Every structure is written in C-alpha cells, then in structure tokens.
Amino acid sequence: VKVHTVEHILSALTGMGIDNAVIEMDANEPPIGDGSSAPYVELIKSAGIVELDVPRRYLEVREAVTIETKGGSILTILPSKQFRVSVTCVGPENRITQYFDAVITPETYEKELAPARTFTFYEDLKPLLEKGLIKGGSLENAVVIRGEELMSKEPMRFINEFARHKLSLIHISEPT
C-alpha cells in the first residue's frame, strides 16, 4: 500500500513535539482539510498527547552544515541552544520573495506555522493535474497565484504565508 500527501500530518506531528504515533487510514491519502497543517494540530490536541517513558534521542549539531539541492535550495544548519529557523522563499522569476524567522516551540508552531496553506502558481496547475496530483485541491484549500493576483477564496492568513508554509513542511520539532 502506498500512502501519498502525508506532509501536513507529518508537519503537525513533529511541530507539536510528537515523534511516535500510530495513524490509521482507510484511503491512500489523508484529507486536504483547509490546505494547512492546522486541522491536524486540532485533531492531535483533541486526542491528547501522552509522554513515553523512553528518553528521546537527538542529533547534536556541533558545526555548520550546508546542503544545496539540484533545484538550488540551500539548507544551512548551525549549532544553537535554541531551535531557531529562518527561511527565505523566492518564487519563479523572483515573483514572490518572503522571509520568516522564529524560535520554534509547539506553541509557535501552532500559531505561526500550522495555519499557513499550500500554494501554487496558476501555470503549474495543468501539469500537476496531468500527473494525477492535487485531486482534492480547490480555491478553498490552496492559494493559487495568477500573475500578481490571488485567485483563492480566502485572503492571505499572513503577509509571508508562503515562507511559513514551506518552513512548516520541513517537519520540525523543538529539541528538549
């Protein structure tokens, strides 16, 4: 069985500090909800969080590490006592440039990252549909950008919503 489009669930779990969970599904992808991780945060909170009697294991960053993807994205990890994340999101042809920076805790994740929605550019819709992707996508659960116009039903939730959404999908959690 293959399960697709799990990034919002994984983001919500790790953003809320959960590293051990069982999720049962009766379809090959979870519901899209409102296009953000926020509905999953609410489900996690309503189910409750139970701490295990097993200590967490972490990797300790002792020196700077930089990784660059084939697409040109750059990730730099620096040693720190806090879990601070900064992200700059630049769209095609520099159409959108946004920045977000925060010390991440479950509380800041819930308020500052989880509500940020999926977004795409209008010209990317046809290729995505032809690949059989975004089947549950609509203007109610995604921000669609056409030129300089937002086609979505709801206005932006944050002035830098795209940067926050990209950051939320890194599947973050605060080290303890």
Residue positions per predicted region:
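C-terminal regulatory domains involved in ligand/effector binding and gene-expression control
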Residues: V1-D19, E24-S173
